């Protein structure tokens, strides 16, 4: 069955916690995601939790991952089994035109993101 990653990405980015998302599942048993947390949400969340507002530090923090997982789970609750995002990791930086990860019309460049995050995607399927 084919899944529309754009539909799932669109639903993920409607969540206040998630600014950008790239969903991958080409010829794989399930979908995984590379996510960019919303910086405003992240700063507010970190302040309430008394944690640093730096994604590099927060990405490994269990409470932060759980908060993002809850956003993913909210979306998964509206999706069919094959559309659910099972695992995710965080992008190293937002997707932008300048880093060539987005087109001028603000669409993600899937082929570039797949290359940039090849190791993270592979790790999500291994783990």
Give the label of every model feature segment.
Residues 76, 83, 117-127:
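A short N-terminal helical cap/helix-turn-helix that marks the beginning
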């Amino acid at each position: 069955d084919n899944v529309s990653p754009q539909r799932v990405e669109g639903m993920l980015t409607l969540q206040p916690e998630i600014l950008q998302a790239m969903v991958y599942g080409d010829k794989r048993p399930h979908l995984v995601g590379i996510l960019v947390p919303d910086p405003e949400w992240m700063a507010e969340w970190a302040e309430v939790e008394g944690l640093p507002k730096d994604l590099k530090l927060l990405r490994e923090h269990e409470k932060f991952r759980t908060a993002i997982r809850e956003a993913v789970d909210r979306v998964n609750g509206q999706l069919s089994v094959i559309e659910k995002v099972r695992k995710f990791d965080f992008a190293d930086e937002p997707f932008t035109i300048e880093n060539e990860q987005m087109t001028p019309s603000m669409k993600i460049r899937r082929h570039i993101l797949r290359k940039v995050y090849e190791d993270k995607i592979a790790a999500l399927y291994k783990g």
